[in-house]
Amino acid sequence: MIVIACLDDNGGMMFNHRRQSQDRVLWAHIAALVGDARLWMNHYSAQQFDAESIQHLNVDDAFLQEAVDGDYCFVEDAALAPFERWIEKIIIFRWHRTYPADQHFDIDLSGGNWKICESVEFTGHSHERISMEVYLR
């Protein structure tokens, strides 16, 4: 599976059961990135996406158990460490801001198992700068 996650400067993902931030330009970027591949997410995350813009949108609260090689998984509020051995690529979108957080990204990207292979910046709607970092094993 290919994981997509949005993180603040401290690796935060959620605070008080809510996403830290969102950006409609980012949603369009994710739709283009996924193309005609399957994109999995839970019901909470699906609320922010336009199902018509993503051809193969799959919504299931157990989506990390359903995804197979080559499938994308948009993750906001799930622990990923238990699934790390099945993850082939990680795509991180960074907000370049610090938000309150009580749930953090739980895979160590600096520990040597993952190497950054691409980094791109773009301007969002509500964020002056969003970075996309792609990590491979």
Positions of predicted regions on the chain:
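Enzymes that bind and transform nitrogen-containing heteroaromatic metabolites
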Residues: 1-137
